[in-house]
Swiss-Prot record:
The gene is serS. L-serine binds at T230, A231, E232, E284, S384. This is Serine--tRNA ligase. It is found in: Cytoplasm. HAMAP family: Ser_tRNA_synth_type1. Consists of two distinct domains, a catalytic core and a N-terminal extension that is involved in tRNA binding. Its EC number is 6.1.1.11. One of its GO terms (biological process) is seryl-tRNA aminoacylation. Catalyzes the attachment of serine to tRNA(Ser). Is also able to aminoacylate tRNA(Sec) with serine, to form the misacylated tRNA L-seryl-tRNA(Sec), which will be further converted into selenocysteinyl-tRNA(Sec). It catalyses: tRNA(Ser) + L-serine + ATP = L-seryl-tRNA(Ser) + AMP + diphosphate + H(+); tRNA(Sec) + L-serine + ATP = L-seryl-tRNA(Sec) + AMP + diphosphate + H(+).
Length: 426
């Protein structure tokens, strides 16, 4: 949600910032609503003050025996009592319209975000690792996985397209990856482990920006709750409506949860394999910070995600998203794209975003600086640390052997109960 005060102070700058994201100009329409709402609010105050004044004057007139004046004042008070509810209703409607307008447009991009229309305009920042030189033609995970326990047919039989059934050694590897990620993020990177709800209310999904614009991408239950598309929703909303102390910041949280997405906008994309699923697991990272700390926290969070890929020995590249490819709530986003030799391409495995105070305004999440009387909105950040299923895909493709087996990365061996290789016989 945007700050109406900033729009009042510099409408041109607001329109220019949104224009970088292909939106606008919208400032004048928002300010028109704001002006009318403020006029009505002022009139309400005037009516309330005059009603109180006239009510007192009635008693004074009656005390003097001036019945004519008293009756005139009574008539005026009666008229004001009729006018006031109408003004209150108009003010309520205008406030709702203004808030809807402030919530309808995406976050304004940071100054160093490159302009562009789509992913083709993203800017590569760095690369890590050298893709393995295979002595054979590497397979895609969709071809390699079924013999190792990645069962697409059973998943489709039970639940339909974009569901997968993991069995035996494959399920063990998936669990090992998730546990390793959690251990690294909590033990070395200082994130507090959480187990949040998977079902959330409208207010929570609005707070993190999925509602109202992206409802079709979500699953809704019959009682009106939503299955989380990411633990970002639950973790970020943990500070909804709160005023935190400065000493509580930064607040760093992590959670391993199932995530549920309808993939309404992904028809025809990644229909084979384990890349794009309706249900998948992810280790999410969320940070709540002071405004002046969010940029450095963004770099730190991204490094925490990169550390998982480095520990697993998976080549990847870091990409700065352009204005046309960023998510709705982000002011700056880094994507980490892992090398998949079977596809011969880098594919997204983590997205780390600084949302500034955009989500905090929607959630009314604040903090009180030490020694200050007033409060300020916090800044919120989120990132994948990592998507477990896509990391599984990357391990399968990068560690595959010519005989169809897959070597287990060294850092995962303590989690595998002595299993050092996935084999078709296993």
């Amino acid at each position: 949600m945007h700050d109406i005060r900033l729009i009042r102070e510099n409408a041109e700058a607001f329109d220019a910032a949104l224009a970088r994201r292909g939106v606008g100009p919208v400032a004048q329409s928002i300010l028109s609503l704001d002006s009318r709402r403020r006029e009505i609010a002022t009139r309400m105050q005037e009516v309330q003050a005059r009603r109180n004044e006239a009510s007192k004057a009635i008693g004074a007139a009656m005390g003097k025996g001036d019945k004519d004046t008293a009756e005139a004042l009574k008539a005026e008070v009666a008229a004001l009592k009729v006018e006031l509810p109408a003004l209150e209703e108009e003010e309520r409607q205008l406030t709702a319209q203004q808030n809807a307008a402030l919530a309808a447009y995406p976050n304004t991009p940071a100054a160093d975000v490159p302009e562009g229309a789509d992913e083709a305009d993203n800017v590569e920042v760095s690369r890590w690792g050298t893709p393995r030189d295979f002595a054979f033609a590497p397979k895609e995970h969709a071809d390699l996985g079924p013999a190792l326990g990645l069962d697409f047919e059973t998943g489709a039989l039970i639940s339909g397209a974009r569901f997968t059934f993991l069995k035996g050694q494959m399920a063990r590897l998936h669990r090992a990856l998730a546990q390793f990620m959690l251990d690294r993020q909590t033990g070395e990177n200082g994130y507090m482990e959480c187990i949040p709800p998977l079902l959330v209310k409208d207010e929570a999904v609005f707070g993190t920006g999925q509602l109202p614009k992206f409802a079709e991408d979500l699953f809704r239950t019959t009682d009106g709750r939503w299955l989380i598309p990411t633990a970002e929703v639950s973790l970020t909303n943990a500070v909804q409506g709160q005023i935190l102390g400065e000493a509580q910041l930064p607040l760093r949280m992590t959670a391993l949860t199932p995530c549920f997405r309808s993939e309404a906008g992904a028809a025809g994309r990644d229909t084979r394999g384990f890349i794009r699923q309706h249900q998948f697991e992810k280790v999410e990272l969320v940070s709540i910070t002071r405004p002046e700390d969010s940029e450095s926290e963004h770099e730190r969070m991204t490094q925490c995600a990169e550390g998982i890929l480095q520990a697993l020995g998976l080549p990847y590249r870091k990409v700065l998203l352009c204005t046309g490819d960023m998510g709705f709530t982000a002011r700056k986003t880094y994507d980490l794209e892992v090398w998949l030799p079977g596809q011969g391409a880098y594919r997204e495995i983590s997205s780390c975003s600084n949302c500034g105070d955009f989500q905090a305004r929607r959630m009314n999440a604040r903090y009180r600086p030490e020694g200050a009387k007033g409060t300020e909105f916090v800044h919120t950040l989120n990132g994948s640390g990592l998507a477990v299923g896509r990391t599984l895909v990357a391990v399968l493709e990068n560690y595959q052997q010519e005989d169809g087996s897959v070597a287990v990365p060294e850092v995962l061996l303590p989690y595998m109960g002595g299993l050092a290789r996935l084999t078709p016989q296993g």
